[in-house]
């Protein structure tokens, strides 16, 4: 186990393209930190720099008490798990799991013991003699995890390990990976573009956008207090509603002169962006917001009402036992649930 520290780490490619702006953060010993963001945001580049697969242009990277900028990947005592499993098809499960230890010169008895221990954790004992082609996608991913576990690394690096699995298996493996990481207590960095994975698995989340860190925080901090409109719209399903508004004398209004309840923008006059999550508002004849419902989406446990507030797209999440119809209605908003952002840069006010 080890603490990971990045100090002003930057990545610039030879053509001058900046993949990652100078970035600094610390992952405490034993924590699972998730790097999340859209394609091209720099999350995989950052992970590859920690792994030693990408050269660091500027800055300093430490794993434990060692600065590892110039240390080869094989000597960093890390273990990676990829989305494509990277298993040898001609080897058995046991041989795949123990291959790295064999290359280190460990004796057969010790390798066998470590493989058996990892197989116990991952429920793979009955599959140790099988080839990868005889396994399901979830079982192959467990083998890849077992291969990482037997190395007893200071740091696990997960690069979108669940992307090739179907939705049901992703949910199952998400729980298994989190439980396993907690059991082992090994520091972990986990890359994903899926905000659900980030929210459900992380001790802390690092949200990246266009090579820049937008926000670092716990899942609750990210969700309850997004630092920007990007974070607000990217984290959460369905995403936060963002409306153009106007602030004057502390009050906030939308188009048509609609006042936004529970919103105060003291010290800020002019254009503003108003954020309200779909689950923080509900149909109420005595409500303050006029809402025109165009489409109702049935999701089983809840309904999503899609329409417009002040001529702008807006969605509302309601429980399945609440009736809803298309057309005009009023909405109430949960006190303290209105988020205000700068209209130009999108930063939280």
UniProtKB/Swiss-Prot annotation:
It holds the Pfam family OB_MalK. GO terms for molecular function: ABC-type glycerol-3-phosphate transporter activity; ATP binding; ATP hydrolysis activity. Residues 4-235 form the ABC transporter domain. It comes from the Bacteria. It is a peripheral membrane protein. One of its GO terms (cellular component) is ATP-binding cassette (ABC) transporter complex, substrate-binding subunit-containing. The complex is composed of two ATP-binding proteins (UgpC), two transmembrane proteins (UgpA and UgpE) and a solute-binding protein (UgpB). Belongs to the ABC transporter superfamily. sn-glycerol-3-phosphate importer (TC 3.A.1.1.3) family. Part of the ABC transporter complex UgpBAEC involved in sn-glycerol-3-phosphate (G3P) import. Responsible for energy coupling to the transport system. This is sn-glycerol-3-phosphate import ATP-binding protein UgpC. The gene is ugpC.
